[in-house]
């Protein structure tokens, strides 16, 4: 068979015309060094700050340092098998985590992957971990309460929906216990909860999850875990991941509560990353932007107005406000609240609950120090009945503390001083509360009414605990409807005052506690 040159030429032209050229421009680079979870990459000329970089083995790193001829990135996950010369590439994306109702009741890692062995999670989409906080115009003032179930907190340092209230204290003073009880108390309130565990032992986190399950609170909670065995990068990013999951509910006109346990360990993880990236250290070897690390996180906790929710949901949700309430936890060393990170977070938040080791060790639990614990915006959100009845509590305790200090040196005290000291001791005793036993609004109101109107004067100090438990049992058994209505309404008027007085008078007449 003989082919002439014309046919060959036509055939080649035809094949060339049919050839489909698919070209893909990729921005690739090469690893030049690996050390302690930090990789330096040469060649990624178009990488962005915070961009995800694809590594071999379906892993990612986050670009944090953009230098003249190299990129410093932190590896998210194991890095032992990474070596110099390996090729990496840009993804053009920043870190996103799954969000949605499918996460409720689940335990996930920083990247939103399930680690509880309950199968895949059905998420409603993905959200970037770094989001700009809502602006001033999009916000609404805090005027609805978050009940923790603790008498000492709800009466003296009330928390509102959309507030940032710091829980601060030394190790082993009951900070996590207070936060977990606050989550348990939201079982029937409709508030979704997110618990972010940063740098804790896996056994401690497992215990928290078990307790939430035992008290039927886990189905309403997302647990985000970056344990002590995880890399510094995952511990640093965990609060932002949890916040993105909480914002899903806030932006759809619902209420959410997020616990960061604790931000001291996140700051240490960020310090580790910064020093490995050779950023200049500042006070206590923290980098210069450690304030911004926490401020950009905590500013995302807010109460947003109806227009914001309507705009975000494209008109699907109308006339509803959303809120994300944050309870960050900070661990102090020997009660030093003037250290770098504690002062930073105190200045960012709307108040703090200071837990003191001396009070804790003397059996006063929760160990709230009423002198320096404050809620800057929670007063306007406090339930009316609690606000009305709790007015004298803080004053009584402050006067008691002052008098108690002087009474140690005084040999003879007048009757008025003795009476004030006795009253202060009884109030202190009454504010004690066991873990996992939150009180409803009506129960708290009844106890505070007893304090306010002198029903404790005839009760001996060592009988205060049994007096309270017997009173609450009596009220729940005989006045269940009234207690339920008072919890739901939270109002206070002459009729309610008479009803509370009637319960206490009836209890005193009939009960042998």
Swiss-Prot record:
Disulfide bonds: none annotated. The keyword Chaperone does not apply. ATP binds at residues 169-176. InterPro entries: ATP_synth_asu-like_sf, ATP_synth_asu_C, ATP_synth_asu_C_sf, ATP_synth_F1_a_nt-bd_dom, ATP_synth_F1_asu, ATPase_a/bsu_AS, ATPase_F1/V1/A1_a/bsu_N, ATPase_F1/V1/A1_a/bsu_N_sf. It catalyses: ATP + H2O + 4 H(+)(in) = ADP + phosphate + 5 H(+)(out). Its EC number is 7.1.2.2. Produces ATP from ADP in the presence of a proton gradient across the membrane. The alpha chain is a regulatory subunit. Belongs to the ATPase alpha/beta chains family. This is ATP synthase subunit alpha.
């Amino acid at each position: 068979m003989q082919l002439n040159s014309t046919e060959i030429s036509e055939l080649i032209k035809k094949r060339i015309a049919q050839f489909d050229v698919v070209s893909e421009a990729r921005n690739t680079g090469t690893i030049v060094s690996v050390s302690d979870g930090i990789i330096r990459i040469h060649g990624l000329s178009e990488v962005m700050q915070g961009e995800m970089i694809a590594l071999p083995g379906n892993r990612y790193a986050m670009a944090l340092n953009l230098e003249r001829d190299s990129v410093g990135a932190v590896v998210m996950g194991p890095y032992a098998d990474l070596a110099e010369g390996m090729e990496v590439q840009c993804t053009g994306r920043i870190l996103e985590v799954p969000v949605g109702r499918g996460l409720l009741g689940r335990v996930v890692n920083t990247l939103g992957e399930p680690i509880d062995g309950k199968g895949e999670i059905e998420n409603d989409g993905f959200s970037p971990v770094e989001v700009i906080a809502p602006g001033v115009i999009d916000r609404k003032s805090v005027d609805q309460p978050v009940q923790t179930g603790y008498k000492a907190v709800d009466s003296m340092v009330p928390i509102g929906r959309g507030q940032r209230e710091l829980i601060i204290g030394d190790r082993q003073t009951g900070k996590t216990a207070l936060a977990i009880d606050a989550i348990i108390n939201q079982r029937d309130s409709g508030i979704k909860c997110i618990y972010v565990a940063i740098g804790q032992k896996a056994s401690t986190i497992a215990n928290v999850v078990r307790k939430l399950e035992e008290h039927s609170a886990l189905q309403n909670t997302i647990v985000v875990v970056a344990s002590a065995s995880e890399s510094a990068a995952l511990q640093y990013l965990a609060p932002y991941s949890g916040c993105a999951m909480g914002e899903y509910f806030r932006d759809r006109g619902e209420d959410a509560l997020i616990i960061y346990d604790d931000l001291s360990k996140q700051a240490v993880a960020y310090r580790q990353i910064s020093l490995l990236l050779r950023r200049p250290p500042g006070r206590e070897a923290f980098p210069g932007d450690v304030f911004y690390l926490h401020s950009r996180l905590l500013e995302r906790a807010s109460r947003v107005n109806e227009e914001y929710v309507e705009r975000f949901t494209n008109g699907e949700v109308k006339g509803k406000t959303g809120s994300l309430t944050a309870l960050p936890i900070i661990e102090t060393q020997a009660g030093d609240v003037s250290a770098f990170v504690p002062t930073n977070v105190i200045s960012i938040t709307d108040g703090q609950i200071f837990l003191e080791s001396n009070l804790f060790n003397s059996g006063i639990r929760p160990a709230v120090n009423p002198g320096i614990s404050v809620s800057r915006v929670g007063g306007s959100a406090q339930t009316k009945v609690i606000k009305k009845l709790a007015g004298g509590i803080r004053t009584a305790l402050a006067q008691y503390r002052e008098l108690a200090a002087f009474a140690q040196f005084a040999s003879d005290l007048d009757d008025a001083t003795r009476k004030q000291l006795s009253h202060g001791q009884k109030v202190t005793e009454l504010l004690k509360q066991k873990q996992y036993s939150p009180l409803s609004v009506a129960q708290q109101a009844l106890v505070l009414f007893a304090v306010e109107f002198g029903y404790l004067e005839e009760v001996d100090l060592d009988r205060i605990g049994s007096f309270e438990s017997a009173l609450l049992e009596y009220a729940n058994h005989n006045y269940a409807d009234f207690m339920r209505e008072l919890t739901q309404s939270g109002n206070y008027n002459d009729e309610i005052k008479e009803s509370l007085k009637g319960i206490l008078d009836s209890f005193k007449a009939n009960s042998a506690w």
